[in-house]
Amino acid sequence: MSRPRKRWRDVDGVFLLDKPQGMSSNDIMQKVKRLFQANKAGHTGALDPLATGMLPICLGEATKFSQFLLDADKRYLVTAKLGERTDTSDAEGQVVETREVHVETPQILTALEQFRGDILQVPTMFSALKHNGKPLYEYARQGITVEREARPITIFELNFIEYHAPFLTLEVHCSKGTYIRTLVDDLGEVLGCGAHVTMLRRTAVADYPVAEMIPINELQLLAESFPLSELDRLLLPTDTAVSKLPALHLDVEQSKAIGFGQRVKFANEQQLGGQVRLFSAENLFLGVALIDGNIIRPQRLITQSA
């Protein structure tokens, strides 16, 4: 007897997943999508299979705002093994160089200083960045090295946690586009012994609370035991994806015009500029707009239910 076909549905919000080790971000996102029976889903910045931790999954209308989380600051806890370099700069790769480790804590503290603040970083070949329409990791798997330009990133914090040779643990608060594997590889070169990542955990994306993260096995159990309405209670509101933007509340007429995608004039007593979150007179999240003087220009809007 064939199983009844799942009914996919419109469900909106952000699910804070505690990603397990060993799965790709896309595979785990698809699993979350199936458990919620959601029509649409998207993640907000891939974690390597080796990595664990916070992976916000946007469902439904929240996918329209996933770019804001891709662009958000992130925090990581990382353990590096000194003395070995690998082709992927993590423990999943092949060891390509081994060196003796004669490194003490004071040397590490000094070396860390040059990686704080605004720096340039050359992305790893084992990344999803594209060259001529093809991901770099595909070239890398063929043994081809492509010249990459250094990109500006910001390391807001780089904190020493502990060092028990050859293992070094650090805490990193960084801007978008930062490759922790590359950071560790570069640090290993400065220390003169090489290094690669053995453990990586993302501890924060934007301002999302760590306490709200849910492991996939827990979500699976809930999905097997409770109706979908109980799963929906785990979702954070869609507007949390853009919580960094200032809020602008509209009156009834302004809300109606924005709903039609029209530009709206307003007094702009708060002297707002740039992007804002829009809320209706009933305090419903409408989307994101650009403020240009006293004009509200809609950019990304929620599709309102009939």
Swiss-Prot record:
GO molecular function, a single term: RNA binding
Q: Enumerate the SUPFAM superfamilies for this protein.
A: Pseudouridine synthase (SSF55120), PUA domain-like (SSF88697)
Catalytic residue list: D48
The keyword Amino-acid biosynthesis appears for this protein: no
The reactions it catalyses are: uridine(55) in tRNA = pseudouridine(55) in tRNA
Q: Sorted alphabetically, which InterPro entries does this protein's record hold?
A: PsdUridine_synth_cat_dom_sf (IPR020103), PsdUridine_synth_N (IPR002501), PUA-like_sf (IPR015947), PUA_sf (IPR036974), tRNA_psdUridine_synth_TruB (IPR014780), tRNA_sdUridine_synth_fam1_C (IPR015240), TruB_C (IPR032819)
The domain of life for this entry's organism is Bacteria
User: Among its keywords, does the record have Nucleotidyltransferase?
Assistant: no
Top enzyme class? isomerase
Q: Which GO terms describe its biological process?
A: mRNA pseudouridine synthesis; tRNA pseudouridine synthesis
Cite the entry's keywords alphabetically: Isomerase, tRNA processing
UniProt EC number: 5.4.99.25
Query: Per the similarity annotation, which family is this?
Result: Belongs to the pseudouridine synthase TruB family. Type 1 subfamily.
Q: Quote the NCBIfam families the UniProt record gives.
A: TruB
Instruction: Give the protein's function.
Output: Responsible for synthesis of pseudouridine from uracil-55 in the psi GC loop of transfer RNAs.
Please give the HAMAP family that the UniProt record associates with this protein: TruB_bact
Q: What is this protein called?
A: tRNA pseudouridine synthase B
UniProt gene name? truB
